[in-house]
Amino acid sequence: MFTKRKEKIHFIGIGGIGMSAIASVLNAIGFTITGSDLAKTAKTESLESSGIKVYYGHKAQNIEDDVTAVVTSSAISPTNEEIIEAKSKKITVISRGEMLAELMRLRYGIAISGSHGKTTTTSLISQIMMHAGLNPVCIIGGNHFNLKSNAACNDLSSEYMVCEADESDGSFLRLSPVINVVTNIDNDHLDYYGNVEALRVAFLEFINKVPFYGCSFLCFEDNVVKDLSKSANKKYYSYGFSKDYDFYVDRDSIRVEAPITYFTAYHNSECLGEFSVPLIGIHNVLNSLASIGVGIHLGIDIADIKEGLKTFEGVGRRLNKLYDKEITLFDDYAHHPTEIKATLSSVRNAYKNRRIIAVFQPHRYSRTELLLNDFEYAFNDADEVIISDIYAAGESPIPGISGEIICDVVRKQNNHVRYIPNIEDVLPVLDDIKKDGDIILTLGAGNIVRISNEYARKLQNG
């Protein structure tokens, strides 16, 4: 680790999915961890149960005199009074990304990047490595159900670390992985990058960050990633559905027996056999293939890779089944049009003869404005669509930008869409329109998960 002394480190916004994972690992290593957040949640309660002191509300007095460093995320304003207090005490203030980089610096790092699929791929690789006994330090952007956490540090002597590489604020360029994965590159986070070209340049820099003995796994089903590979100056392996790629899956071998997908994978034309994973969707076949490639590169036995995938229990908010009786209720984090389309396509292919009701809470005014026209085809696999107003995530409203204008765009391809501004008013509508056999799918990165969990409880209680 980066210091022999075990100082006290304070996290502002400790309940966030990325911040809480890093705090958990540092706590397991032996650092004294404190943190603050605005409200008590299941995650902050979990941190408290592990011995971490959590303050509720941001106050200057939360920065104790013996704090050595303060970690903050991009969601925290520079004018936050805890940051001001830390600086007045000459306490080092660093970003979440910088602390993550410190955790990786002296380890064999495996970093998973991409606009979509990071959390699932990170979780799959973690599961394979844990099953093989490598026991990596894990930093995951969702709750890994096998781990029952978004972090793992079960073996302090482990040389391996697996984490998501977050491109949203450029912090993934701080990391020093030996292996990296790029799942895809989409038009997202342009509020930070300014334009698509700058985003692509950042990903190319990430690809080229591996050392001479390292490598990248690049998904060639994504044309942007495939094009960037031409400028890569480090070793990489391609993966996808073509026999021309280093790792590939025979499309004809894919079969779905929901919730399990079976497929046959190859490495340089050598058949690796049939694999199964309890996930649906072509995108998850690709995520699984990336994890197979990483496992083989690490020297993990094929039997262990297969068993690791087979025993994967899933990750939070990635097509989680919350209820399955007269209707089936799923919840998913998808909020970008590409993610929504992929998720709905997966459900449609797995449950061909069932009616699908999609409930979507848009995320951020800026993202809605930027991606508005991309929503046109995103809901084509849904029979009924409900769209609420936008979850602001701290942003100020943009005049003319609302959930209603997304409805207008979606109606160009799907007439069965309705606008319900208040997400709290969705449940009575679902009660009115649902029929036995329906699939209800809630989508979004905001607080829609609270609504889906509430509806699941209501259904359970009759």
UniProtKB/Swiss-Prot annotation:
Alphabetic keyword roster: ATP-binding, Cell cycle, Cell division, Cell shape, Cell wall biogenesis/degradation, Cytoplasm, Ligase, Nucleotide-binding, Peptidoglycan synthesis
Catalyzed chemical reaction(s): UDP-N-acetyl-alpha-D-muramate + L-alanine + ATP = UDP-N-acetyl-alpha-D-muramoyl-L-alanine + ADP + phosphate + H(+)
GO MF annotations, alphabetized: ATP binding; UDP-N-acetylmuramate-L-alanine ligase activity
Residues binding ATP, per UniProt: 114-120
Keyword Transmembrane helix among UniProt keywords: no
Family matches, as Gene3D superfamilies: Mur ligase, C-terminal domain, Mur-like, catalytic domain, NAD(P)-binding Rossmann-like Domain
Pathway the protein contributes to: Cell wall biogenesis; peptidoglycan biosynthesis
Protein's cellular compartments: Cytoplasm
Similarity-based family: Belongs to the MurCDEF family.
InterPro entries hit by this protein: Mur-like_cat_sf, Mur_ligase_C, Mur_ligase_C_dom_sf, Mur_ligase_cen, Mur_ligase_N, MurCDEF_pg_biosynth, UDP-N-AcMur_Ala_ligase_MurC
Record-given protein name: UDP-N-acetylmuramate--L-alanine ligase
Major localization class: cytoplasm
Function in brief: Cell wall formation.
GO biological process, one term: regulation of cell shape
Keyword Cell inner membrane included in the entry's annotation: no
Enzyme Commission (EC) number: 6.3.2.8
NCBIfam families: murC
Gene: murC
GO annotation, cellular component aspect: cytoplasm
